[in-house]
């Protein structure tokens, strides 16, 4: 891919913001970081992750051709509102928010007509926080979702897609924000809800650590959770998530009922179904 030779600003220099900066380091002449955490900015400058850090976004936004917003869901709209007059003319804005809802419509209404906002969601992360834990490998072979809006220019949708592949994502999918939230409630949010519930159901009447195997570790890795971020994500998509939790409860009840009735046939059928489906997914 040919180098873009333009300026990039990353708003929110945490884990995902750091991954964007590292994976796009060679694609832009200048990368600015915008964050309220001066330690994160100082660290990123010293490591060459960004060229310069700013607490006040006005100057970097006015110079940037592409802006990637890596803030919590409830902060994105507020940031756009406060800075709608600071963006460079004809710049492109994208985000990394895990729940879309009506946010994209509201954001586009606030922006000047010559600014294009392309919704996106990198399906990657870790159970740790901070730019110091970011790496190029986090995005490698992960999935990337773009949620196009009717007002988006095709060239800008293509830009975000090309950059996603450059960052290491193996697949880029375009879907509506509504469909995104419905699917994510199952593939991401329900998984986190199950992991949290599993860990919290530990009765602590024995030394759990002595009896843990790979299955428990694999299922509960994501239970080490950023409570502020995931509260935002769960609450912002609660209607979809509640439906998926209820569907999961139905499936779990089938197993529970089979155990109560000593019904090995039904239990084995559930095992067979999950094995077939898991092979299809992988």
Describe the function of each predicted region.
Residues 138-221:
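Internal alpha-helical scaffold of NAD(P)-dependent oxidoreductase catalytic cores
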């Amino acid at each position: 891919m040919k180098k873009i030779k333009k300026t990039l600003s990353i708003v929110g220099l945490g884990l995902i913001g750091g991954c964007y900066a590292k994976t796009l380091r060679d694609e832009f002449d200048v990368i600015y970081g915008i964050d309220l955490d001066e330690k994160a900015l100082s660290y990123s400058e010293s490591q060459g992750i960004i060229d310069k850090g700013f607490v006040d976004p006005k100057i970097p936004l006015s110079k940037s051709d592409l802006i990637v917003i890596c803030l919590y869901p409830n902060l994105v709209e507020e940031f756009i509102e406060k800075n709608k007059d600071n963006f460079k003319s004809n710049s492109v804005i994208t985000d990394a928010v895990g729940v879309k809802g009506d946010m994209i419509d509201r954001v586009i209404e606030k922006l000047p007509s010559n600014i294009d906002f392309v919704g996106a969601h990198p399906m990657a992360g870790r159970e740790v926080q901070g730019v110091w834990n970011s790496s190029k490998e986090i995005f490698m072979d992960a999935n990337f979702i773009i949620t196009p809006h009717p007002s988006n220019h095709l060239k800008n949708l293509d830009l975000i897609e090309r950059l996603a592949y450059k960052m290491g994502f193996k697949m880029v999918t375009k879907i509506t924000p509504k469909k995104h939230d419905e699917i994510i409630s199952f593939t991401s949010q329900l998984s986190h809800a199950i992991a949290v519930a599993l860990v919290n159901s530990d009765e602590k009447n024995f030394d759990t650590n002595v009896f843990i195997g790979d299955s428990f570790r694999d299922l509960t890795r994501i239970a080490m959770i950023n409570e502020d971020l995931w509260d935002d994500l769960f609450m912002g998509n609660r209607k979809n998530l509640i439906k998926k939790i209820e569907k999961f409860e139905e499936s779990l009840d089938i197993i529970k009922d089979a155990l109560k009735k000593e019904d090995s046939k039904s239990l084995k059928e559930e095992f067979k179904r999950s094995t077939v489906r898991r092979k299809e997914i992988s």
